[in-house]
C-alpha cells in the first residue's frame, strides 16, 4: 500500500468484474486494517451487511480516511465498463498522452514521459471478461489485447498486469491423482495462452483447499482451510521460475501475509484471523508463528 502514496507511481485499472466504487472500498478496507487494526469488509464500509449501517466508531474511522481516499483517487485511474481490445488500446493511449508525448523520430514512433521517474502499472482484471467484437473469438480478442499491451510496454515503459483465470476442473483432478498436488501450470490458463507467452513474468495462485488436499508443502490445509494459498512463479525472464511460496489470504479485507514455516506452527487456529499479524515480532532465534510480509515486484 505504501506505493500508492508515491508521487511517481500511477495505476490505470481496468476493472471488468467489480465497480470502481467497490474497488476503492477494497483498498480502503486494507488501509483501515493496516492503520487502525480493524477488520472492515467492503460490505461493512458500504453498509451492505445484514446488520445495516456502520457503528458510530467505525463511521468515524471511515471519515478520517477520506483525505487518504482523495489522494489515492488522484493516483489511480479506474475504467469499470465493458472492454474490448480496441477500447483498451485507445483509452490507454489517451491516458499515456496526458503524462507524456508520442513523437516520431526517423520514421519510428516514440514516447517521452513528462516524468522520467514515473511508473505506470496497467491492470486488466480480468482478461477473460474482454468483450469479443468484429467477429473475433474470445481467444483472438485476448491475443490482440495482449499484443497491444506488449507494444505499449516496449514503447512507453508501462508495466501491464494481465490477470487471467485458470481452467482447473479436469487438469487439477488428474494431476492430483498422479502427483498428489494440483499446483498451477501455464497450461491451465483459460481461453488463451497468448498473454503467458507475451509476459515476462507469470505468477499462479493456487488454493489446495478447493481440491480437498489435506496437506500441502507441510501445511495442515484441513485446519487452514480457505485461508491458505500457494503462489508460484511459473515463468520469469529475469531469474528463477517454478519457485513457490505459501501465504495466508484474508478475503474479507483483501490482504496476503506470509505465515511461518510449517515446522514453527503449533497453533493453527489463530491463522483464521489476520489479527495474528499484529502480534509483536520475536527474535530471529525464536520466531515461531511470527508474521512476515510478502512483497512482489512486477
Q: Model-flagged regions — what are they?
A:
Residues 1-49, 126-131, 198-200:
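Walker A/P-loop NTP-binding active-site region of P-loop NTPases
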Residues 6, 33-43, 53, 66-70, ...:
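C-terminal regions of RecA-like/P-loop NTPase motor modules
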Residues 13, 123-124, 158-165:
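Structural recognition of the conserved hydrophobic beta-strand(s) that form the central parallel beta-sheet
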Residues 50-54, 77, 131-143, 174-183:
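Flexible beta-alpha connector loops of hexameric P-loop NTPases
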Residues 62-79:
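A short helix-to-beta-strand connector/capping loop
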Residues 103-105, 109-132, 136-150:
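Helical hairpin unit composed of two closely spaced alpha helices linked by a short loop
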Residues 129, 165-172:
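Signature of the SF2 helicase/ATPase Hel1-core->accessory helical subdomain module
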Amino acid at each position: 500500500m505504501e506505493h500508492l502514496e508515491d508521487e511517481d507511481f500511477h495505476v490505470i485499472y481496468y476493472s471488468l468484474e467489480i465497480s470502481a466504487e467497490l474497488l476503492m472500498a477494497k483498498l480502503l478496507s486494507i488501509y483501515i486494517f493496516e492503520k487502525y487494526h480493524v477488520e472492515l469488509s467492503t460490505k461493512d464500509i458500504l453498509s451492505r451487511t445484514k446488520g445495516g449501517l456502520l457503528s458510530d466508531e467505525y463511521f468515524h474511522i471511515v471519515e478520517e480516511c477520506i483525505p487518504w481516499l482523495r489522494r489515492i483517487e488522484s493516483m489511480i485511474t479506474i475504467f469499470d465498463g465493458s472492454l474490448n481490445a480496441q477500447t483498451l488500446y485507445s483509452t490507454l493511449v489517451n491516458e499515456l498522452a496526458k503524462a507524456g508525448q508520442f513523437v516520431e523520430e526517423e520514421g519510428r514512433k516514440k514516447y517521452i514521459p513528462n516524468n522520467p521517474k514515473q511508473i505506470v502499472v496497467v491492470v486488466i482484471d480480468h482478461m477473460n471478461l474482454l468483450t469479443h467484437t468484429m467477429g473475433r473469438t474470445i481467444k483472438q480478442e485476448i491475443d490482440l489485447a495482449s499484443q497491444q499491451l506488449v507494444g505499449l510496454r516496449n514503447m512507453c515503459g508501462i508495466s501491464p498486469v494481465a490477470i487471467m483465470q485458470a481452467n482447473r476442473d479436469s487438469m487439477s483432478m488428474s494431476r492430483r491423482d498422479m502427483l498428489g498436488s494440483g499446483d498451477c501450470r501455464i497450461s491451465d490458463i483459460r481461453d488463451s495462452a497468448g498473454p503467458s507467452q507475451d509476459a515476462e513474468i507469470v505468477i499462479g495462485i493456487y488454493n489446495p483447499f478447493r481440491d480437498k488436499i489435506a496437506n500441502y508443502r507441510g501445511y495442515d490445509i484441513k485446519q487452514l482451510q480457505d485461508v491458505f494459498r500457494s503462489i508460484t512463479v511459473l515463468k520469469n525472464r529475469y531469474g528463477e521460475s517454478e519457485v513457490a511460496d505459501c501465504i495466508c489470504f484474508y478475503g474479507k479485507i483483501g490482504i496476503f501475509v506470509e505465515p511461518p514455516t510449517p515446522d514453527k506452527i503449533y497453533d493453527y487456529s489463530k491463522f483464521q484471523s489476520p489479527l495474528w499479524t499484529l502480534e509483536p515480532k520475536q527474535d530471529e532465534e525464536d520466531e515461531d508463528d511470527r508474521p512476515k510480509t510478502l512483497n512482489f515486484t512486477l
